[in-house]
Each structure stands twice: as C-alpha cells, then as structure tokens.
C-alpha cells in the first residue's frame, strides 16, 4: 500500500514518468528478487512426484477429495443397495410403512394382520418357489441364447472377412446367328478346303447318280435274260399226252400215215 501511495504521489507531482524511473525503482526490484527463492522452494517441495492440481490447494490449506473413477466400486455399491432392499423397498420406506400401519390398525390389529400375512405366505410358499425356479430357468435359457448369438455373430463376421463374397459371373453374350457357311475339317492331303454345296449342286449330283444307275440296271437285265435257258414247247399228241416240241416232230416223222 505504501508503494502504491508513493506512486500516486509521484504521479500527482509530475504528470510524466519516464521508463528509466520505473525500472530503477528500488522496492520493486527487491520484491522481485525475494520472490525467486520462494518459487524454487515450491518446486523442491514437489520433487520428482507427479504434479496434480490438488497439491497446490493442499499447501494453501484447502483439501478436496478427488472422485474415484473405479467402475468396480460403483457396481459393488449398487449391488449392496439392491441386496439391502426387499422387493424394491428399502429400510426407510419399510419404517414409514410400519409407522402408518401402527397408526391405522393399532397394536392389536397390527399383530392380527401380521399373523394373517404369515399364514398366507406359508400357504403360497410352494407356489413362490415354483415361480422362482421357472424364472431361473427362463433366465438361464435367455443367457444361453444370448451367449450363442454373441458367439455366432463374430464367427460369421470372421468367415465373411476370410471368404469375401465373390461377385456373380457376368452373363454370356447373346448368340448371334452366323451368316457364314460352315467350314468342314481340312484333310491333310487336300491343299484347298472344300466349299459348301448348294441346292443346285445336290440336284446335279442326284441326276448324275440316276443316269449312272439306269444303264447298270439295263445291263443286269440283259445278263439275266441270256443266262436263262430256253424252255421247250409242249405239243399235245392225238392220244392226249403232252410231249415236247422236238419229240412230237420225231414221232410224226417216225409214224407212218394211216390207211383207211
């Protein structure tokens, strides 16, 4: 404060202050030099430990407990809270319900109500156990199915990665009818490939074959006629017996004429 008052007094006495006057002010330089060892002592106290924002607050006298980021502890606390509650009703809620029941039924009525509740619970105890068993079985089956689904999905993903889906082959191009004549296989002895025959060529070949067959048929007929021997003609005699032509002549020549 004294330093500030001196600066104000000097400014009021002389409105213009030079830079050399400010930098040569003795109290500021002494204060700045005195602050250096304090910083070095701070860093020596810290040492080689890890720097955290709470260390400086501890030196100032302020203590802040850092929040724990352990999820396991949170889960344990939640499970303890769930175990402490009965059917979703905790200890304070149960106490409030008991006080209200005492006010409504009274001590005698509350005892009777508790007895009736005990009897009903005893009667329904086997059914409750059956329901618990059914719920456990259902829960186990659900967990198994979920586990199988979780196991099958990575297997399918790995199979898809190892065996990528191949694209379907492209469809074959449409067949275009060829206008060119079919080319037959070349014989090794032929130097030129034979050309395709037209309908006129086929007609010529058939006519030539018919002409070649007609003289062959006539020759075969002549040969069959020459090979067959001449059959003798039969002549009937006056006696009524049939004789060949040559024998009839001989008999006529040999037999004398009849005289009446």
UniProtKB/Swiss-Prot annotation:
Parts of the chain on the Stromal side: 107-260
Subcellular location, record wording: Plastid, Chloroplast thylakoid membrane
Transit peptide: 1-83
Biased composition (Polar residues): 152-163, 186-196, 240-254
Basic and acidic residues: compositionally biased ranges: 201-210
Single biological process term from Gene Ontology: protein transport by the Tat complex
Coarse class of the protein's main subcellular location: plastid
GO molecular function: proton motive force dependent protein transmembrane transporter activity
GO cellular component: chloroplast; chloroplast envelope; chloroplast thylakoid; chloroplast thylakoid membrane; plastid; TAT protein transport complex; thylakoid
Membrane topology: Single-pass membrane protein
Keywords, ordered alphabetically: Chloroplast, Membrane, Plastid, Protein transport, Thylakoid, Transit peptide, Translocation, Transmembrane, Transmembrane helix, Transport
Compositionally biased region (Low complexity): 221-239
Bias kind Pro residues: ranges: 165-176
Region (Disordered): 146-260
Quaternary context: In thylakoid membranes, TATC and TATB form a large receptor complex, containing about eight TATC-TATB pairs, which binds the precursor protein. Twin arginine signal peptide promotes pH-triggered docking of TATA oligomers to TATC-TATB receptor complex, inducing a conformational switch of TATA that results in activation of the translocase. TATA dissociates from TATC-TATB upon completion of translocation.
Function of the protein: Part of the twin-arginine translocation (Tat) system that transports large folded proteins containing a characteristic twin-arginine motif in their signal peptide across the thylakoid membrane. Involved in delta pH-dependent protein transport required for chloroplast development, especially thylakoid membrane formation. TATC and TATB mediate precursor recognition, whereas TATA facilitates translocation.
Annotated protein name in UniProt: Sec-independent protein translocase protein TATB, chloroplastic
Organism: Arabidopsis thaliana
Gene: TATB
């Amino acid at each position: 404060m004294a330093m500030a008052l001196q600066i104000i007094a000097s400014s009021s006495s002389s409105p213009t202050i030079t830079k050399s006057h400010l930098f040569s002010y003795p109290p500021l330089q002494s204060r700045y030099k005195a602050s250096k060892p304090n910083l070095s002592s701070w860093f020596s106290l810290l040492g080689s430990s890890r720097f955290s924002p709470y260390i400086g607050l501890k030196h100032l006298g302020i203590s802040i407990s850092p929040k724990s980021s352990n999820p396991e502890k949170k889960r344990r606390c939640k499970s303890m809270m769930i175990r402490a509650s009965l059917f979703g009703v905790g200890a304070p809620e149960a106490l409030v319900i008991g006080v209200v029941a005492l006010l409504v039924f009274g001590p005698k009525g509350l005892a009777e109500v508790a007895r009736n509740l005990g009897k009903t619970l005893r009667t329904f105890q086997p059914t409750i156990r059956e329901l618990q068993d059914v719920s456990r079985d259902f829960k186990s089956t659900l967990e198994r199915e979920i586990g199988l689904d979780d196991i099958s999905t990575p297997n399918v993903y790995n199979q898809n990665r190892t065996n990528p889906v191949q694209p379907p082959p492209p469809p074959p191009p449409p067949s275009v009818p060829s206008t060119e004549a079919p080319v037959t296989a070349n014989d090794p002895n032929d130097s030129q490939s034979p050309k395709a025959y037209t309908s006129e060529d086929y007609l010529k070949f058939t006519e030539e074959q018919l002409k070649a067959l007609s003289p062959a048929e006539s020759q075969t007929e002549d040969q069959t006629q020459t090979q067959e021997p001449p059959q003798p003609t039969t002549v009937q005699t006056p006696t009524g017996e049939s004789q060949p032509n040559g024998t009839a002549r001989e008999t006529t020549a040999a037999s004398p004429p009849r005289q009446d």
